């Protein structure tokens, strides 16, 4: 059984990838692929949403290992029910938490063929959009709004996770360069070895 974990990073077309996977359940099923969504709420409904993800990532090492076994058992049940042999979970919020999620992934590797997919993007291309999204509309930090200069320094810090992912999971990790010249959904599908029908709207892009 295989698990493909799409880990981001942010502002690299994640929403487009998730939308394509979510709306093509039948096409995926024909390839024995099942999309689990973006949260770990299959394990516990409390892990749904952004706050739930943080609760999940706050588990200690022993809890993470136990949760990984539960996750594997739940995937096994789904595989038996629907015939899937490959599962996909996509959440860009995982990218910056490589150390916290390590016990979970290390235990999972004992039970499944784990494949990680990450997209990396030139920060010049995404910082203004990220500041608007995470600094204003979906404000992550407590207290007053921060200036672009202050918030950008924090946002750019997520790149520090990239070498850790590569060093820790190099044999299981595929890193793709994201830019506007690619169709990120097509690229993701090719990377994962799956095919999806073309979108109804030509508007599925990479933003």
Feature locations, PLM:
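PAPS-dependent sulfotransferase catalytic core
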Residues: 1-84, 187-207
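Structured loops at beta-to-helix junctions and adjacent beta-edge loops in soluble globular domains
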Residues: 9, 92, 178-179
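PAPS-dependent sulfotransferase catalytic domain
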Residues: 27, 99-200
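A generic structural motif
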Residues: 35-40, 115-120, 199-207
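Feature targets compositionally biased, intrinsically disordered low-complexity regions
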Residues: 82, 142, 202-204
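Active-site-proximal cofactor/substrate-binding loop regions of enzyme domains
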Residues: 89
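Short acidic, S/G/P-rich loop/turn micro-motifs used as interaction or catalytic elements
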Residues: 94-97
């Amino acid at each position: 059984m295989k698990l493909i974990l799409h880990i981001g990073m942010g502002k690299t077309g994640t929403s487009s990838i998730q939308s394509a996977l979510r709306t093509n359940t039948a096409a995926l099923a024909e390839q024995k692929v099942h999309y689990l969504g973006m949260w770990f709420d299959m394990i516990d409904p409390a892990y749904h949403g952004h706050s739930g993800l943080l609760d999940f990532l706050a588990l200690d090492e022993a809890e993470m290992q136990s949760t990984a076994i539960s996750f594997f058992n739940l995937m096994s049940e789904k595989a038996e029910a629907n015939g899937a042999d490959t599962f996909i979970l996509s959440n860009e919020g995982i990218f910056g938490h490589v150390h916290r999620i390590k016990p979970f992934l290390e235990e999972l590797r004992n039970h499944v063929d784990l494949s990680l997919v990450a997209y990396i993007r030139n920060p010049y291309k995404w910082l203004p959009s990220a500041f608007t999204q995470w600094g204003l509309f979906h404000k992550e930090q407590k207290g007053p709004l921060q200036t672009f200069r202050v918030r950008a320094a924090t946002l750019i810090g997520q790149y520090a996770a990239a070498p850790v992912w590569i060093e820790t999971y190099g044999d299981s990790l595929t890193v793709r360069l994201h830019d506007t010249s690619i169709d990120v959904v097509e690229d993701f599908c090719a990377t994962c070895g799956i095919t999806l029908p073309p979108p109804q709207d030509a508007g599925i892009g990479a933003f």
